[in-house]
Amino acid sequence: MEGPEITAAEAVIDNGSFGTRTIRFETGRLAKQAAGSAAVYLDGESFLLSATTAGKSPKDQFDFFPLTVDVEERSYAAGKIPGSFFRREGRPSTEAILTCRLIDRPLRPSFVKGLRNEVQVVVSVMALHPDDAYDVVAINVASLSTQLSGLPFSGPIGGVRIALIDGQWVAFPRYSELERAVFDMVVAGRVVTTADGSQDVAIMMVEAEATEGSWNLIKDQGATAPTEEVVAAGLEAAKPFIAELVRAQAEVAATAAKPTAAFPTFPDYQDDVYQAVFEAASADLTAALQIGGKQDRETRIDEVKEAVKAQLADAFAGREKEVSAAYRSVQKALIRQRVLKDGVRIDGRGLADIRTLSAEVEVLPRVHGSALFERGETQILGVTTLNMLRMEQQLDTLSPVTRKRYMHNYNFPPYSTGETGRVGSPKRREIGHGALAERALVPVLPAREDFPYAIRQVSEALGSNGSTSMGSVCASTLSLLNAGVPLRAAVAGIAMGLISDTVDGETRYAALTDILGAEDAFGDMDFKVAGTKEFVTAIQLDTKLDGIPASVLAGALTQARDARLHILDVMAEAIDAPDEMSPTAPRIITVKVPVDKIGEVIGPKGKMINQIQEDTGADISIEDDGTVFIGAVDGPSAEAARAAVNAIANPTMPEVGERYLGTVVKTTTFGAFVSLMPGKDGLLHISQLRKLSGGKRVDNVEDVVAVGQKVQVEIAEIDPRGKLSLVPVVAEEASAEAAAAEPADA
């Protein structure tokens, strides 16, 4: 029996000292009834299948292209049984939804304009190595299955993840390698022929972020910070990898692709309609587009539109949809020409001007942290909630990440644009915007050990006219600081746009800072950049052009940095350091117990831990390494729970107010470490040593105490991480207390 005829090609990605990755594409074996199907292997360990199918009849009643992308994560791919009640896969995970968006964004603009047949791309993850991510692999296999389907599609499209590790851009990095990365980018593009006949990679989509460990790598280990220049170099570094992936896909398609079928297209309008609308509307529309306020401007634009439709009703009877579409195109052309010729935008701003900014914290009562950030008519409310680490999100996905301490949710109610609509579960767009804001802030969050809280951040888009996602980054920074979260640095975000066209025979580019919603819709690029004063923390780029010159992109990045620094200054006026934690927020402290004592703290069937929680009102959770997190609404309850835990697991654990004759074991520039008992040291700060030097200022610790010296000390404070702060007990204090105690004893 003859087997299926399989067509295959390989792309070999050379990462130098990091080795090679092999991506093998093949078709002809699986899902043969789909219009186009393709499979991909990553190093022979991970396997994805993509199938592209088109509806037989066009949906000519639609005024958009009905493309659907679905990603199916199969638990068997990772050797798991689903954790749901019915033990089968249910709704897609956040990771799957974000992958759908990564695929959709470069695929959608690559179809012929005017296509109205329903197109569905389904990517199934069927085998996955635990150290690999599947999202960029999915972009490539979805591109190939679509290229093979006979649809009018201008692919192939290559997608690559590159990470900056040890100063080198590494393609398709493993999760284990990403621990050493400072920046992580997903870049998608296609190969185009330039004006001089050479080939280049046109970047279509970028999704990038600084990693969770980037701050420590940069500050402590001297790693390269992801500045604008470094990011621009990374985009160039991605191009050869994309070209290799496109080459392999094209090799398969050259043999196995179906001929492009004749699909009916439905252009928005004919040239005669456009010309008539332009002549009838341009004068009034030009004036309407110069109105500053969004609501007033849109009201006037609608009035002009209705007048034009009435004027042309007889000449174009039955072609009302064409008139409306042509009116929108005239509006787009007028906006673009004004920007390129006069350097003036819809609301009268210059190209690099930012709308009026305002920032305010503590806007809601009782919540743990809140802030209101406004940029023009975009208004975002940020709200922070803190809780114990056991409330962090547990993830049942194919990736090795099983929990998430920082959760960012974004809500976009219909009233934010003055419209009615469905309210309920989040749409893909809301999930994507929340994920972008989350990635922008993760690099500056305090370490888990330093701030043992689960953090939920909610961004409410109360008003929308341009980049609510970047407004969410700003509002979230303010809200987190208001909640007392010790961020390593403040983060702000800005949305950039690009308009390009031929003016007087030459191609001109205009980068726009802080774009409006209309500039996003009518422009050629949506480029969101978030970061601190020092480096970039997140980027999202979508472009409708075949490619953006590197110089233009570098200029947009620099323009974005200038805007970001200005916004950070405005935010600093509202709050520039963490506030005291809200009285309604839980107080969380930690204590370390020996691993072999964990069972005693829990007790049979949880008896001991439940009793402590009942007696003190505190919540207690215990990690496998013996770290005990104690959370309570006030300090005394938390301290009572800590004392109860110590009584079981650390019976000799010191408490505040206890005195010891300790031994100096180490001196530093800021104080001396004193051993109170085996394995338990405390810090005697240099400011406290004045008591031992007759009240004189101490500049050198060794002038007062030396290693091996005995010192009488008292425990003044135990910080949330269990570290002890000591104060010296001088002879006069000790004798005075002894004298005061004698009459009581008599």
Swiss-Prot record:
Subcellular location: Cytoplasm
UniProt-listed Enzyme Commission number(s): 2.7.7.8
GO CC field: cytosol
KH domain segment(s): 586-648
Cofactor(s) this protein cannot do without: Mg(2+)
An annotated Gene Ontology molecular function: polyribonucleotide nucleotidyltransferase activity
Disulphide bond pairs: none
Role, per record: Involved in mRNA degradation. Catalyzes the phosphorolysis of single-stranded polyribonucleotides processively in the 3'- to 5'-direction.
Name of the protein in its database record: Polyribonucleotide nucleotidyltransferase
Native source species: Kineococcus radiotolerans (strain ATCC BAA-149 / DSM 14245 / SRS30216)
Gene: pnp
